[in-house]
């Protein structure tokens, strides 16, 4: 089976994207490119990057894009998210940074950005920017195993690829069983449900991307 490349945090940098594409051309067996959000950023080449993602060059790996936290904030600023007005972006950035972001993303791209999915399910893998709970949900090595299991269970997947933290990691949740007792007025029943081994994988950000082989479950950072 052909490998996947999982990228996030391009931040509007066309030069970085071109370098990643060039690297992937040299990687034997890499056939699928997933861009897990945060494509945009206050970079002069942001508009050109979005055009390239929407209209790949002939030799490019076809990018499969989902929206991330940055896209969510931009769409909120433009009224695509109802009453939400990018409160988180305003809390984390000053007004000049917000204005730069607005100026570097041409409004011609807004409908395309708004059409992107929250996440993708491929085989038994969930590909998402944050988590199944929220696009801004930041999972990393310190996240409670109970939270990780919840995020996996919501999607009903065995592997969850996440980008929000910007870190590269693989956390393994070992398999086991969930036991429950159900008691009524006549008897008590014991139910056992097997839980498979599951993983949460941080794909990194920018030039730090991840390669994954679904056939062997091998990950390369």
Regions of interest found by a model, annotated:
Residues 42-43, 49-122, 145-150:
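Active-site neighborhood of divalent metal-dependent phosphoester bond hydrolases
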Residues 7-8, 33-38, 64-69, 128, ...:
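Active-site neighborhood of phospho(di)ester-bond hydrolases with catalytic His/Asp-centered motifs
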Residues 1-5, 120-126, 195-199:
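Beta-strand-turn-beta hairpins that frame and shape the catalytic cleft
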Residues 11-16, 41-44, 70-75, 135, ...:
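Active-site environment of divalent metal-dependent phosphoester hydrolases
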Residues 1-52, 56-59:
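N-terminal active-site segment of His-dependent metallophosphoesterases
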Residues 179-221:
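Binuclear metal-dependent phosphoesterase catalytic core
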Residues 82-94, 175-194:
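Charged, glycine/proline-rich intrinsically disordered loops and linkers
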Residues 27-28, 32, 102-174:
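His/acidic metal-ligating clusters that form di-metal
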């Amino acid at each position: 089976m052909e490998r996947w490349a999982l990228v996030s945090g391009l931040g509007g940098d066309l030069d970085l994207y071109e370098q990643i594409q060039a690297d992937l051309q040299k990687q034997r067996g890499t056939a699928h490119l997933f861009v897990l959000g945060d494509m945009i950023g206050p970079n002069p080449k942001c508009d050109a990057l979005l055009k390239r993602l929407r209209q790949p060059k002939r030799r490019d790996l076809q990018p499969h894009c989902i929206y991330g936290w940055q896209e969510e904030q931009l769409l909120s600023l433009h009224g695509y998210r109802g009453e939400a007005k990018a409160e988180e972006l305003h809390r984390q950035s000053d007004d000049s940074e917000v204005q730069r972001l607005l100026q570097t993303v041409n409004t011609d791209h807004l409908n395309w950005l708004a059409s992107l999915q929250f996440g993708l399910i491929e085989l038994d893998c969930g590909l998402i920017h944050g988590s199944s709970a929220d696009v801004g949900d930041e999972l990393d090595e310190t996240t409670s195993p109970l939270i990780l299991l919840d995020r996996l269970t919501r999607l009903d997947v065995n592997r969850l690829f996440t980008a929000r933290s910007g870190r590269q990691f693989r956390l393994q949740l070992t398999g086991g069983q969930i036991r429950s007792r159900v008691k009524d007025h006549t008897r008590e029943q014991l139910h056992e449900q097997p839980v498979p081994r599951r993983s949460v994988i941080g794909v990194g950000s920018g030039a730090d991307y991840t390669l994954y082989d679904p056939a062997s479950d091998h990950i390369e950072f």
